[in-house]
Each structure stands twice: as C-alpha cells, then as structure tokens.
Amino acid sequence: MTKGILGRKIGMTQVFAENGELIPVTVIAANPNVVLQKKTTETDGYNAIQLGFEDKREKLTNKPEQGHTAKASTTPKRFIREIRDADVDGLEVGQEVKVEVFAAGEIVDVTGISKGKGFQGVIKRHGQSRGPMSHGSRYHRRPGSMGPVAPNRVFKGKKLAGRMGGDQVTIQNLEIVQVDTERNLLLVKGNVPGAKKSLVVVQGAVKVSK
C-alpha cells in the first residue's frame, strides 16, 4: 500500500548525521491534509484516496467544490490530489493525514512542477553539442539536420528549440532524513522539483532500489 501527503517546498539546507556526515536536504512543509474521498475497486475500478491541502476562501469556490468538501466536514481546499493504491480501509473521509505517516529512513518519490526556463535552444533544452566556434565555421548552436530529404517534412518529435521547464517531474528514491511533527516538516535528502513555495506530492517509493 502506498502512503502520501501534499506539501510546499520551503527550500534547501543541510544537517549533520550522527557520524558527522553533512547531508543536503530539502525542507517540505506538509501541514495536515484532509481525506476528501475514498475510491475503491468496486465503485471506481481502482483504490485511491483524495487529499485536500490548504484552505481556500469560499468566495473563490463553486457549488460543486463546496458540496464535495462539505461531505468531508471541512472547508474548500486549494489543492486536491489523488494517492493511488493507498490504504483505503485504514482511512476515513474527513480524517487528517499528517507528517507522522512517514518516518526517518523511509524512501519516497517526490513529484512537483519544474522551474520554468522560458524559450531555450537545443543545447540547454536537450543537451546537444555545439559546433566549432572558429576556423570559418558558421555552425555554432544550431539544432542540426531536420531529417532526410525524401519525406519533405520535419517529423513530429524532432528536438528543437522551445519553451523549457514547467513540466511535472518525479524524483524517485529519496530518503527522509528527519520528520518534525511539531512544525509539520519533512527533511528529504537531496533536491526536489519546483521553485520555493511550490506544491509537491510526497509518496512512498514505487521502485525501491536494493
């Protein structure tokens, strides 16, 4: 069974392990989430829980949103996400999910929206190599060949310049270094996707490396 929680990325810092090792960590503020809905194989074809995170002003919500959260006896939520294959039987609608669901040493996957980089060329966007910069070369940072002559067109999927970033990215197999239950904080080893204050979803790892 998978467990998960929604939170906001605060930023990065570093902590010391007991053996003196310096560990870079990302701080995630995961205030209590509320279970808004339970989905089961019988009713929906799969098992999942729907979590709501951060209160939203009622003025900014529509009637369906208000009715949906009212069933869980809570206020409208700004962010709503599903955690698939969760422990449906162990949770009830309206119940709070806190950082205590995780413990130090657990391995998790963290999903977020990557930082937007704007319009970028193929070298930065796709990691292509540049051409010679001197000796009469006129090919420096271009995308290269557009493909064979015969099709008379450029195939879909050709790696070209374009808008970079702003994509959903999941970093797998990150270790939880510390869980601060008093301040609702998770300290995760390494970096996670997204800018500061952006939404992240922390879930139990799907592919735990042995």
From Swiss-Prot:
Keywords: Ribonucleoprotein, Ribosomal protein, RNA-binding, rRNA-binding
Keyword rRNA-binding: yes
GO biological process, one term: translation
GO-annotated molecular function: rRNA binding; structural constituent of ribosome
InterPro entries assigned to the protein according to its UniProt record, in alphabetical order: Ribosomal_uL3, Ribosomal_uL3_bac/org-type, Ribosomal_uL3_CS, Transl_B-barrel_sf
Region feature Disordered, mapped onto this chain: 125-151
Secretion signal span: none
Keyword rRNA-binding set for record: yes
Highest taxon, organism lineage: Bacteria
Cellular component terms (Gene Ontology): cytosolic large ribosomal subunit
Subunit structure: Part of the 50S ribosomal subunit. Forms a cluster with proteins L14 and L19.
Family: Belongs to the universal ribosomal protein uL3 family.
Protein task: One of the primary rRNA binding proteins, it binds directly near the 3'-end of the 23S rRNA, where it nucleates assembly of the 50S subunit.
Name of this protein: Large ribosomal subunit protein uL3
Species assigned in the record: Bacillus mycoides (strain KBAB4)
Lineage: Bacteria, Bacillati, Bacillota, Bacilli, Bacillales
